[in-house]
Curated annotation (Swiss-Prot):
Its EC number is 6.1.1.20. This is Phenylalanine--tRNA ligase alpha subunit. NCBIfam families: pheS. CDD domains: PheRS_alpha_core. Its cofactor is Mg(2+). One of its GO terms (biological process) is phenylalanyl-tRNA aminoacylation. It comes from Rhodospirillum centenum (strain ATCC 51521 / SW). Binds 2 magnesium ions per tetramer. The gene is pheS. Mg(2+) binds at E258. Belongs to the class-II aminoacyl-tRNA synthetase family. Phe-tRNA synthetase alpha subunit type 1 subfamily. It comes from the Bacteria.
Length: 358
């Protein structure tokens, strides 16, 4: 066997014997590297005659190509074997149950606000917002609330240090200031709802220092009590999803509406369990009335031309009634177990076409 044939056999045997990719790389360097055996033989051609150098060069180039092809073929085999070993070691049992996915839940307050907006949007209302810190004028005076009214007392209202001009400031006790700001800034007709946070100095099972309200305001020409009743009736039946839900209006008093009425819905309390529907008993859910002429005048509107109605309710209260939540304070305790129980599926926005809650 010639030296070239012996070299060919040795190099190919080393390639085929490589058990893994690092060993194959060592075989490649030993054959084709700068100090490899083929490279060394090419360096020895300087002592040959031109004819011999040409013949030996062709032989070594052919050997170089053959070894390179053998290396690539062996590399492909080794990669497949390595992949097969990895797949065997990392095998997944597809019959095992999947890992539980952590999924957030929509808070009942957020869900209830979305439901309210969906209902009133279908009646042409838009959403209006205002600041939580209000002036005495927007929170009390413009709403025809006299200075001696109990709502202005320190034990009911959170007062803040006066503004730079000395004007009294409070944490708003209702979202009615949004109605005042809207009437001052926009021209009638007006049809808005104003959901948001409100603040009162109270804390027990049915009261918290901060809670949410939504109020509605409609201003236009020839608006009357019939429009108010029809709007509330449609809302109550859509929200509680009871088509024949009875709704009752009881005369009441609010400084900012005249006439004023408390709104009750039908219910049952048999066996200590509250059920919404036509069951012979009544439950109050909101206050309402025709906007007081003095309030219209305070906002620069002529009561002889413009009339309107307004109503408002506590968002937590109607959420508790609809979803059977017994304690108002739990809305704000950040208990994930409570939220998992009473929360709602994310991205499932309520609408009247598919149903408010699913």
């Amino acid at each position: 066997m010639t030296a070239l044939a012996e070299l060919t056999a040795d190099l190919l045997a080393a390639v085929e014997a490589a058990p893994d990719l690092p060993a194959l790389e060592e075989a490649r360097v030993a054959a084709l590297g700068k100090k490899g055996r083929i490279t060394a033989m090419m360096g020895d051609m300087r002592s040959l005659t031109p004819e011999e150098r040409k013949e030996r060069g062709q032989q070594l180039n052919a050997l170089k190509d053959r070894v390179a092809e053998a290396i690539e073929a062996r590399r492909t085999v080794l990669k497949k074997e390595a992949l097969a070993q990895r797949l065997e070691a990392e095998r997944i049992d597809v019959t095992l149950p999947v890992r539980p996915e952590a999924e957030g839940r929509i808070h009942p307050i957020s869900q209830t606000i979305d439901e309210i907006i969906a209902i009133f949007a279908s009646m042409g209302f838009t959403v209006a917002e205002g600041p939580d810190i209000e002036s005495d004028f927007h929170n009390f005076t413009a709403l025809n609330i006299p200075p001696e009214h109990p709502a202005r007392q320190m034990h009911d209202t959170f007062y803040l240090p006066p503004a730079g001009d000395g004007a009294a400031r409070v944490l708003r006790t209702h979202t009615s200031p949004v109605q005042i700001r809207t009437m001052l800034q926009e021209k009638p007709p007006i049809r808005i709802i104003a959901p948001g946070r409100t603040y009162r100095s109270d804390y027990d099972q049915t009261h918290t220092p901060m809670f949410h309200q939504v109020e509605a305001l409609v201003i236009g020409e020839d608006i009357n009590m019939g429009h108010l009743k029809g709007c509330i009736l449609e809302f109550a039946r859509a929200f509680f999803q009871v088509d024949d839900l009875p709704v009752r209006f009881r005369p009441s008093f609010f400084p900012f509406t005249e006439p004023s009425a408390e709104v009750d819905i039908g219910c049952s309390r048999k066996g200590g369990e509250l059920k919404i529907g036509n069951h012979g008993d009544w439950l109050e859910i909101m206050g309402s009335g025709m906007v007081h002429p003095k309030v219209l005048e305070n906002c620069g509107l002529d009561p002889a031309r413009w009339q309107g109605f307004a109503f408002g309710m506590g968002i937590e209260r109607i959420a508790m009634l609809k979803y059977g939540i017994p304690d108002l304070r739990t809305f704000f305790e950040a208990d994930l177990r409570w939220l998992k129980h009473y929360g709602f599926v994310p991205l499932d926005m309520p609408n009247l076409a598919q149903g408010l809650t699913r």
